Amino acid sequence: MTQTVPYRCGRIAVIGRPNVGKSTLTNALVGTKISIVSNRPQTTRHRLLGIATFPEGQIILVDTPGLHREQKHPMNRLMNRTARGSLEDVDAALLVTESTHWNEEDTLAYNLLNDTGIPVVLVINKIDRFKDKSALLPFLTHINENHTFATIHPVSALKRKGLKTLVSDLLALLPEGGPMFSEDEITDRSQRFLASELVREQVMRQLGKELPYATTVEIEYFTENTGLFRIGALIWVERESQKAIVIGKGGVRLKEIGVKARQQMERLFQTKVFLETWVRVRKDWSNNEAALKTFGYE
């Protein structure tokens, strides 16, 4: 007699310091891009649910901003609060770190998770950088000797390596029960939100080094017609000089941001997109908690 494997469903927080690949991992597990990615800190600023549905169960991933030790900047404080708040009502957590690199921010994240009492799975990301995987052994030994995890998984989120076993172990940590979302849902966020993030992703990719804190994106309009989405996006900066940087000489940079964001939207929304972009100034918005809330930062 064949024994039926029970269906499992639950929420798992994705926690870690900036730039270790949390959003790339979330995208890989969900199977499509819902979280924006760049090599700049503060790329992820909001809590976002990624819904990964499998025959055996449904994993609801709570993608979070990176944890920062430096909290002088209001944006960092806000993102730390968002990350900590994401640990409420989760069944387990993924602590994502970078292969062979463990620093004080990793320890901060580990201690935060250790205090919750929930099962914690360590994901050692970016192992594709190593041709000889035995180079990871000293790091794995150090981790095992000094920390306690439910399981440890070396993976490459970018190359989607090592994810099958990770999914199996994550499902085993979840309670039995039916799915919380339908099979075709991939996130709890609206298309309007995703559009703003895709524009901000291109700003971060092209200007993150020059304007690390100073930009955010607000959707002015979002209309859906058969076969076409019309979207207007405002890119907010803090100085007139920054506005000039975003626009670029002859508007070239702003046009490039718009073209690449539109291409990403068409891929995600599976329809043609007409995208307009503008740049506006609101002085020192990222240092003002009231302004942060106005722009949707929790």
From Swiss-Prot:
First-listed, main subcellular location of the protein, grouped into a coarse class: cytoplasm
Cellular compartments annotated: Cytoplasm; Cell inner membrane
Naturally occurring in which organism (per UniProt): Xylella fastidiosa (strain Temecula1 / ATCC 700964)
GO cellular component: cytosol; plasma membrane
Domain KH type-2: 199-283
GO terms classed as biological process: ribosomal small subunit assembly
Region annotation (G5) ranges: 155-157
Function in brief: An essential GTPase that binds both GDP and GTP, with rapid nucleotide exchange. Plays a role in 16S rRNA processing and 30S ribosomal subunit biogenesis and possibly also in cell cycle regulation and energy metabolism.
Residue span of region G1: 16-23
Chain residue ranges for the region called G3: 63-66
Name of the protein in question: GTPase Era
Membrane topology: Peripheral membrane protein
Region spans: G2: 42-46
Gene Ontology molecular function terms on file: GTP binding; GTPase activity; ribosomal small subunit binding; small ribosomal subunit rRNA binding
Domain Era-type G: 8-176
SUPFAM superfamilies associated with the record: P-loop containing nucleoside triphosphate hydrolases, Prokaryotic type KH domain (KH-domain type II)
Binding site for GTP: 16-23, 63-67, 125-128
